Amino acid sequence: MMKGVSYASNTGYKSDEYNKLVNEAKAMPEQNESWKKFAEAEKLMLEDAYIAPLIQSGMAYMQKEYVSDMFKFPTVPWSYKWADVDKEKKQLNLISTSDIPTIDPSKATDTVSFEVMTNTMEGLVRIDKENKAIPGIAESWETSEDGLTWTFKLRKDAKWSNGDEVTAKDFEYSWKRTLNPETASQYGFIMHDIVGAKEYNLGENKDPDSVGVKAIDDYTLEVKLVRPVTYFDKLMAFGVYLPQNQKFVESQGDTFGTTAKSTLYNGPFTLSEWKIEDHYSMTKNPTYWDNSAVKLDEINTKIVKDANSALNLYETDAIDRVGVTSENVDKYKDSKEFKTMKDSSTYFLQINAGNPQK
């Protein structure tokens, strides 16, 4: 579904009708009704716009049979909290085609960064193997009858890797830092359903206190929305909504999130080593509140840009998972280790027509 995409219209007026349908969809209190309205908008776009759908993507990969409980979903990065390997050394070996651009939740935009943050940090909730939102830093949460106010109750045993407690203030600070126009976060828009967030993010209102996220006390976070968002609890697992320790972030300045030591962690693992364009390692976090559920001691990731080199590493048992490119699918598709997965990305061609640049 291409929600919120603008387009050049063949007829010159249907783009307004499309935008009207999208705005109506966003205002629907029931998710099923919202999807129906989005479907109407999508149908109108495909019939009227200079847009041609191309592909809906997926992925194929190989994974060793001794690896278990390592999973991801289309909108969630690989999660290793519950992962295990059936061998004496509890170590997972992986590759990545690129290095980590940043581990600053306010500035990350890519899958590598989000994967590292998902496993070294924790938000209000975590997504489990059944794609359900389960307690993370929040022990429980509730919504108001009109669906516009969410209240999260935080656990009292969550700590940062420097020993500080993780509090509701860490979430309020983090979200407002992301929305601050000076941060220039590319993902600030994802918070626009929060009262005052859009106006603050776009610089139309310079008062951060106008944003509807507030630490009522150290262990209670209140969020006010402009419309009911039925999936808001799941959204809390997304990397942009992770907490940040204000004192630490400000002490690091521009180096925050750029090295293993210039970042704090509150998740199942810590980033223990990071050698740029070579490798990085995550180690089990002894201060994580649910440390007993973490089975792996270490996750090592080597930067390997060539797909065939990566496959060679897999075949020689140097790594435990590897992506399979389309030209190699036939070679491996009958293997017990071959797996496929749907992706949430849809690619389309948008032609610059009807509105020439001046």
Where are these regions (language model features)?
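Bilobed periplasmic-binding protein-like "clamshell/Venus-flytrap" ligand-binding domains
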Residues: 29-64, 94, 230-236
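Surface-exposed ligand-recognition segments of extracellular binding domains, strongest
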Residues: 68-69, 131-159, 189-247
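Long beta-strand-rich cores associated with HINT superfamily self-processing modules
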Residues: 2-5, 61-91
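Extracytoplasmic
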Residues: 49, 89, 119, 136-138, ...
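N-terminal lobe/hinge region of extracytoplasmic solute-binding protein
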Residues: 61-62, 95-145, 264
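Extracytoplasmic/periplasmic ligand-capture domains
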Residues: 1-44, 48, 127-129, 146-151, ...
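Gly/Pro-rich hinge or "lid" segments in bacterial periplasmic/extracellular proteins
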Residues: 108-111, 129-132, 208-210, 218, ...
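Immediate post-signal peptide segment of exported/extracytoplasmic ligand-binding proteins
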Residues: 82-95, 164, 265, 292-297
